[in-house]
Amino acid sequence: MIHYPATAQSQFEAQGLGYIPMVIEQSGRGERSYDIYSRLLKERIIFLVGPVNDATANLVVAQLLFLEAENPDKDIYFYINSPGGSVTAGMGIYDTMQFVKPDVSTLCVGQAASMGALLLAAGAQGKRFCLPNSRVMIHQPLGGFQGQASDIEIHAKEILFLREKLNHILASHTGQPVEKIALDTDRDNFMSAEQSVAYGIVDKVIASRADAA
């Protein structure tokens, strides 16, 4: 599998997800309980937390499609706290973000590294945000393969193809030249929230909801 290498934290599953809080809502029909992520979904909020893999990508894609069906004219809010992960899984999320009719507003909460940074940049123009102490990191994809020389060559070509494609995607969303993207992603490139604004990954640093208005 070819993937964007995640940062060191991705060696572990996101902490604290073993227990998911439940929310109780009172209504005229009585009480109803939701897990916290389902309750956020009612507010059109999708939360990507932890590594990007096939399982998390399938959930995010399903939620994007559901929210589009619910109201195709109302924005979707995509919160990201991710060290990155699988390129193919991430591209599934990316393509769906571009496919759905509603604008997808992105917000970095904590970190958006590797594929997480690309998804952050892929939000609707003018609606991409970072919280003040967020960290963003971009770099080139990483792949490893063992086997016959001919198979290794095939996988090496695939990695180079994906690197070129990802560089063009990042360039299209940041406004940076592809050549600069290629240079800046040659090694891990960490940015503060303010630096990610200057680079074009996000549009604004916000400290409160009022700042996003």
Curated annotation (Swiss-Prot):
Keywords: Cytoplasm, Hydrolase, Protease, Serine protease. Signal peptide: none annotated. The keyword Protease applies. One of its GO terms (biological process) is protein quality control for misfolded or incompletely synthesized proteins. It catalyses: Hydrolysis of proteins to small peptides in the presence of ATP and magnesium. alpha-casein is the usual test substrate. In the absence of ATP, only oligopeptides shorter than five residues are hydrolyzed (such as succinyl-Leu-Tyr-|-NHMec, and Leu-Tyr-Leu-|-Tyr-Trp, in which cleavage of the -Tyr-|-Leu- and -Tyr-|-Trp bonds also occurs). Its EC number is 3.4.21.92. It is found in: Cytoplasm. CDD domains: S14_ClpP_2 (cd07017). It holds the Pfam family CLP_protease. One of its GO terms (cellular component) is cytoplasm. GO terms for molecular function: ATP-dependent peptidase activity; ATPase binding; serine-type endopeptidase activity. The active site is at S114, H139. Belongs to the peptidase S14 family. Fourteen ClpP subunits assemble into 2 heptameric rings which stack back to back to give a disk-like structure with a central cavity, resembling the structure of eukaryotic proteasomes. Cleaves peptides in various proteins in a process that requires ATP hydrolysis. Has a chymotrypsin-like activity. Plays a major role in the degradation of misfolded proteins. This is ATP-dependent Clp protease proteolytic subunit. It comes from Methylobacillus flagellatus (strain ATCC 51484 / DSM 6875 / VKM B-1610 / KT). The gene is clpP.
